[in-house]
C-alpha cells in the first residue's frame, strides 16, 4: 500500500513539473506577477493600475533577457518603471524589452499595464541569452527604445510591411557594448545576418486561443526554424524592412532571427502578428470581410462561368460575351481605381456595366466581320493570363529578379502571348481548354467571396501589382491548407469534366459556327428572289409591328353602335 501511494505522488509531481515547464495560468499574488525563464504565462491585465512583474534567481551565465507580451488586438504596455516614458516603455499587441544585466544581478523587475477599458488576455514569456549571442535591436537609431527588439508592423489592402532595428554583437556583463558604426569589418555588427520568417495561422480561424497557441512556436530560435517559412535573408547592408502581400482575414506571424556567422549563435526578435484587418471597426471588420456587392457580382459571374465550362464551345456567342466581359472589366477596373477615388461598390457596378459592354462589343465584332483569328486571340490571351498568373503564384514569383516591374511585366506578357501562339494550329482545342479552365476558375472566385481561399490570390496578386506601384517589393506567399486543397480539387474536377464533355460532344461537328452576317445576307437574298418560299410572302418587319400595334389599339376602342340597316329585297 505504501509503495502505491509513493507511485501516485511521483506521477502527480512529474505531471505538475511538465505542465509548469510549458504554461502557467493566473497570478501568484495580487499586483505581482512572477515569471520563470522559458515558461509561458497567461494572465489578464486591467486598466486602473499597472502590475509589477519580477524574475528571481537569474543564472550568472545569462547576459541579457528579452521579455515579450502578446494579445490578440488590444494594446498592452511593458515598462522599466511605473512611470511610462517613451524611451523606457513599449505599447502594442506584441511588445517587449531587453534587460541588459549588471554584474552579480540575479533579480529583475518591470511593469505591465493596459489603457483599454476591457480586461486584456495576455501571454508572456522571458528568454535568456549569453554573451556570445547577438543582441536584437542593439543598434537602434530609428525607434524610441535604446535597445529595441520589437518588430513594427504596418498594413494596408495591398501590402504588409515589417520594420526592425539592427542588432549588435553580444558582450559580457559590465562591459560596454561594441560600437555600432565604428567599422564594417568582420569584427563589427556588419557581419550579422537576418533571417525573416513567416508563419500562417489556420485559415478562417480568428479566435484568440488559436493565436496564442501558435505564437508559442514563434518565440525561440529552434521553434521558429522548425515551424515557420524562411522568406528572405538580409545582410547588414540591406534595409531592415520587408514587405509582404496583405491577406485580409488571414492570421500571419512574422519574426526575425539574427545570426552571427562567426560564432554561429542566434537570437530571435519579438514576433509580430496581423490579420490585415481591424477587430474593432464597424464596417469591414475581420468578422465581416465579405461585401454583399462582391458576393452578388462573383455569384452571377460564376453562374455564367459554370455554363461556359460545360457548354461554351457550343454557345459560341455566349462565350465571346464572357471573354469580352473579362477583358474589358479587368482593364476598366484598373483604370478607374487608379484614376478616381470612388468607393468599391460603385466601382464594382461600373465594372459590371463596362464589362457587359465589352462582351457585347466582341459578339458584335464576330457577327459583323466574322474574323475568327481576332476572337481566338482574345480567348487565348485570357487563358494565357491565367496560366501566367499561376506561374507567378508559385515560389518563382518571389525571385529577386521579378521584384523589378519591367522584368515582371515583360515575362508575364510573354507567357500570356505564348499560349495563343502555341495553339494557333488547333483553335478548337484552345477554345475548349479556355472554356473549361476559365469557367471553372470563376467558380473558385465565387467560393472565395463566401469562404476564404488562397486560390483567389492567383489573379488578385496580379491585380494588386497593376494597381499599386509599391507592390513589386512584396513577397506573395500564401497559406495552402486543407480547404485550399479541397477547392483546388473542385477546380480541377470542373475543368477536366467540362473539357472532356465538350471534346466528346463536338466530335464530327464543324470546328466553329459560320459567319453570322454572311448567313443573314444569304437568307435575305434567298427570300427576295424565291417567290415560292413561304417566307417571301411575309410582310416586312415594320408592317408586321404596325399591324400588331393596331390590333392592340383596337382592344381599347369602344365598339361603334350599329346604325339603320336596309331590309333585304325579296
Swiss-Prot record:
GO cellular component: extracellular exosome; plasma membrane
Gene: TM7SF3
Signal peptide region: 1-21
Single Gene Ontology BP annotation: positive regulation of insulin secretion
Topology term for the membrane: Multi-pass membrane protein
Pfam families named among the record's database cross-references: TM7S3_TM198 (PF13886)
UniProt protein name: Transmembrane 7 superfamily member 3
Disulfide-bonded cysteines: none
UniProt cross-references to InterPro entries, sorted A to Z: TM7S3/TM198-like_dom, TM7SF3
Species annotation: Homo sapiens (Human)
